[in-house]
Every structure is written in C-alpha cells, then in structure tokens.
C-alpha cells in the first residue's frame, strides 16, 4: 500500500498485489527515513499486528538510499507496478541533476510505436503475442542501445547504403567490404542469380562515416561470408565457393571462378559462414547442418556443424573440429587457438585437437563447449525465441579482442557473440584452464531495447575497434515453421527452409563501430602497395588484423625479398 504518494520516489507508482518472500523487519533505523509503502496485515495467521514498513527512502550524508522488500519471488517481477517502483526509486536516488539529464534524453528520443499483427509467433505462450514494433532511424535506434562505460557507439553506415549486412571483411587498404543479402532467407534461385551484392564502403575524409559506396559484385544470391586471398575475395555462395577479382583497377569484379562446390543448399541459415584467413595460410570457416558433400583432390568429403579449412585455390579441404549443432561462429586468438559458437545454446567452443590429427579412420573429441553459463542478458522483456528461452538461440560469430584498442582487461580475453534474438551482442571472458580454456559469461557488450537491433557479425577492424553488422530486422527466427499448436498461427515454409513472414524486412541495415575512449590511434592505416620491409614490420602490429594482412600479402605476392628479414626475425625469436 502506498502511504506517501507525493514523494518523487513514488512517481507513477500504483499499488500492486503479488506473491513474495521476505523476512520480518526488526530494529528499524528510523533516523532520516521516510516510509513510502507498507505491507498491510494479511489477516488471521499473519505474524504482524500492524502495517509493516515495506518501501522507504533515507538520506545518508549527501547520498540517497532507496529500499524495498519486494523482489525475492519472480512473480513480483512480472508486475508492471513493481517495474515502475524500481524505476522511480532509481531516478530519485541518482539525484536531481542526473534525473534532469535523463528526462531531457527521454524527451529527445523517438518513442517506440507498436501494432498488433496476427503473424508474430508466440512460442513462449504469452497471454497474447508481442505486438509488431515499427523500425527506427539509425540515430534513434542508437538511443535505445547501450554500450559499456568508456565505450561509445558510432554509426558508420546505414540504409540505403547498406541493407541486410551478413558478413564483414577489410582489404589491405583498410576499406570495409560487406556481403549484403536481401534475398535471405527464402529467395533462392535455381540459377543462383539474385539481388545480392558485395559492396566496398569507404570513409574518404576521415570523419568516421561511410561516404563512398562501390558495388564490387552483384547478381549474387544469398552470399553468407567473404575473405581476401590471391588479390581477390573468396565468397561463400552455396553450393559453391566463388573467387572474385578485379583485374583493371575499377573496383568491379571481372573474374568469377568456382573454386569449390558441394555446400548444402537445404537451409540458408545452416551453410558456410565466418570465412577468415588462417595462421597456416589456409582459409578457415564454419558450416552448419546443411553440411558439405563433394569431392576435393580426388577424395570424397562429407561433414557438417563445425569448423573447416580450405586451401585458397580450393585444391584441398579438411574438416577440423566437430561441434554439436548449427554452427555460425569462428574466431582466433593471437596464439592461433581456434574458438567458435553455435546457433543453438552453445555460445562458446574451444577447438582443441583437430580431426586431421587422428589417423587410420579413428575419431576423437575435437572441440568442447566451454561456456560456463549459456544465458544471455537482454535489456528488454520483448524477446521472441523458439526454444532454449533466455539462452543463446541464434549465436553468431566468436571474434576476440585482438588489438590494443581495447582496455587491458579485454585484450585476448573477451569474445563477442551475436545474440540477435535478444537484441544484443554478448560477451564471454576466455581464460586458460588445464590444456584448454573456459568461457565466463560477461553479460552483453551491446544491448538494445529496439526490437529490430540484430547483431549478426562482429569483427575487429583495421583501426582496432570492434565493428558490428546490425541485420536490423524484426524477424530473426528461421525455423521451425509456426503452427497454431506451436507458435500460435499457421505459416508456410519457404525455399530456404525458413518460415515465410511478411514482416521480414528488406530495407534496413546498419554498420557500427564500438570505440574505447582510451584507445591509441592505429599506427597502420594501409598496407596497399607496402614494401617488403613495411610488411615485415607490420608483423609486429598490436592488431592481429594487420599481422594477418601482412602475412597474407607476403604469401600471396610471393615476397621472396622479405625472406632475409623474416629469417632474422625467427633467429631473434620473433
């Protein structure tokens, strides 16, 4: 019961009734205390004879203290009145100046707008399905998105320059290349010609924003990843891997070759992804349950749900690490250790002994789930999932903080896993244990109350900062297909094995940078046209991106002139 409704800490608070657990309070300190709510006597059998102080505020020197006995039982947290009580109490506690700043910020933020629709799945069996939230402009969406203290979120590009970004990579000049797929998930074409593109996004004036967009390749159909090799790019484009190259300097692909084929087409969210150049000069990647089945170098290969590597020309392909479900995450630390994530409740794997180490057809454990806690931590209750509720059900990526542009506590420790169904980019702290690693849940690196915020890729860029591809879409769920018995309405399954939903968006997309305010400026801006000596020097960069880029250029371009300097580095223990 509210007994001091006029107090600022009771602003907007209404009385509520809920089950809860608490201890009877004794020896109350009534000094400088104002009681705001009481628990009334429940009737016969209650161990109190008069209303019990339940919620109060106190002053402590220049500080303010807010207390409520509510909150032990989860049923209290379902009460909107309790939410308002906490909000009002916090805003009073932080002081008038902070409260005014908050009010000004909220007044300047576009409100979220909703509409009830009959084609939004309700696997959680809520009393009513969640309503449809209308999209926000990028700058307004950022106002609903939180980053850790000391980091700031910066917008690099948004629609119409980029739509539905699914993969990020940078060339030796530091330019961002993006795989864009408006055809995902169901518009698969028999001839594999579609509406998708590979774009080059550049910041030509150094203000941190994209101001030049070049379409490198178009007519693609659901490309899911790209990486650089042999002067061009390798693109995952099931059933093939394509090699695309510009030979005349106009930033347009005029070479298109199939270097590998056999990737499954049965499900567009279970194919190859996360391509990246490896320490061993092979191309590494992840693949889900759509699997691979084909012949490479005269050998029949068949594998799925794990990590593979491929020679850059496609002449060899090896399955390295077996995961236990649909895989869409891969990352390296600076020691060359391999990590990954899956879409279904396994946000962090460590890849130990590769499958290629087992001889004579023997099989052994090649990867282990190391996350000590699988839950994610959204900042909005409006979460729509199919199963494994409140856990990672769309885990994507596993990049690590491999540059000096992160705080010391992050470097080589923090891994970033997309959780688009929770509208967040999760974070795990990786630490050695025994012969492997463990991953401690470090909550969210980014989290948004905008239900469209959908981080599907996060990578450390040439500036050392973390770059994030925001798919920005209201519908993330791929399958199963909703039915009246499960999901609340009958839907159809599309060609990509995803349920058909008119709320899937094909008009938005964002690329963000998350910048640590204490980060040093990158010493390297570009390795385009770099000399042998410059490439060897770049192997000492404090950013793994530049070390790998220098290594790739030395190998791809056959820089034999660098051999003496490389031998000297090896002899010196470098």
Please describe what each predicted stretch is.
Residues 6-10, 14, 83-95, 333, ...:
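Non-catalytic, well-ordered alpha-helical segments in soluble enzyme domains
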């Amino acid at each position: 019961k509210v007994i001091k409704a006029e107090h600022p800490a009771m602003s907007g608070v209404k009385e509520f009734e809920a089950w809860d657990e608490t201890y009877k309070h004794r020896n109350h300190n009534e000094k400088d205390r104002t009681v705001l709510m009481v628990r009334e006597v429940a009737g016969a059998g209650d161990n109190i004879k008069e209303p019990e102080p339940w919620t109060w505020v106190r002053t402590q020197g220049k500080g303010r203290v807010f207390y409520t006995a509510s909150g032990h039982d989860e049923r209290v947290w379902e009460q909107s009145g309790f939410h308002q009580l906490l909000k009002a109490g916090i805003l009073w506690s932080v002081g008038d100046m902070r409260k005014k700043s908050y009010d000004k910020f909220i007044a300047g933020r576009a409100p979220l707008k909703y509409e009830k629709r009959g084609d939004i799945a309700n696997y959680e069996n809520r009393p009513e399905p969640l309503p449809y939230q209308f999209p926000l402009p990028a700058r307004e969406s950022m106002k609903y998105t939180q980053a850790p203290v000391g980091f700031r979120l910066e917008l690099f590009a948004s629609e119409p320059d980029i739509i539905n970004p699914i993969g990020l990579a940078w060339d030796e000049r530091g330019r961002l290349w993006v795989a864009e797929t408006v055809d995902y998930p169901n518009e698969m074409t028999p001839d594999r010609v579609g509406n998708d593109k590979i774009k080059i996004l550049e910041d030509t004036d150094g203000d941190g924003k994209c101001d030049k967009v070049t379409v490198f390749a178009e007519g693609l159909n659901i490309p899911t990843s790209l990486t650089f090799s042999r002067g061009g790019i390798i693109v995952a484009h099931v059933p093939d891997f394509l090699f695309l190259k510009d030979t005349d300097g106009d930033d347009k692909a005029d070479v298109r070759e199939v270097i590998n084929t056999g990737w499954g087409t049965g499900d567009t969210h279970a194919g190859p992804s996360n391509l990246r150049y490896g320490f061993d000069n092979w191309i590494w990647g992840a693949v889900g349950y759509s699997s691979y089945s084909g012949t490479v170098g005269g050998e029949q290969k068949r594998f799925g749900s794990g990590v593979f590597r491929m020679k850059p020309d496609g002449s060899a392909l090896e399955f390295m690490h077996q995961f236990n479900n649909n895989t869409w995450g891969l990352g390296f630390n600076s020691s060359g250790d391999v990590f990954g994530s899956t879409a279904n409740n396994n946000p962090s794997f460590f890849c130990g002994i590769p499958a290629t180490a087992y001889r004579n057809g023997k099989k052994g454990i090649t990867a282990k789930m190391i996350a000590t806690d699988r839950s994610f931590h959204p900042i909005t209750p409006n979460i729509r999932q199919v199963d494994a509720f409140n856990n990672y059900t769309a885990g994507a990526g596993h990049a690590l903080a491999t540059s000096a542009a992160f705080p010391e506590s992050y470097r080589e420790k923090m891994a970033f896993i997309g959780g688009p169904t929770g509208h967040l980019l999760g974070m795990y702290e990786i630490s050695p244990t025994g012969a492997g690693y463990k991953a401690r849940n470090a909550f969210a690196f980014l989290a948004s109350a905008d239900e469209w915020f959908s981080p599907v890729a996060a990578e450390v860029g040439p500036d050392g900062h973390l770059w994030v591809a925001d798919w920005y879409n209201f519908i993330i769920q791929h399958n199963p297909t909703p039915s009246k018995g499960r999901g609340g309405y009958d839907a159809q399954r599309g060609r990509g094995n995803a349920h058909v939903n008119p709320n899937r968006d094909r008009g938005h997309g964002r690329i963000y940078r998350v910048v640590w305010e204490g980060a040093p400026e990158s010493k390297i801006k570009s390795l385009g046209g770099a000399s042998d000596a410059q490439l060897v020097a770049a192997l000492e960069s404090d950013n793994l991106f530049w070390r790998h880029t220098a290594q790739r250029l030395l190998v791809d371009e056959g820089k034999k002139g660098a051999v003496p300097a490389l031998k000297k580095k090896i002899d010196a223990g470098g």
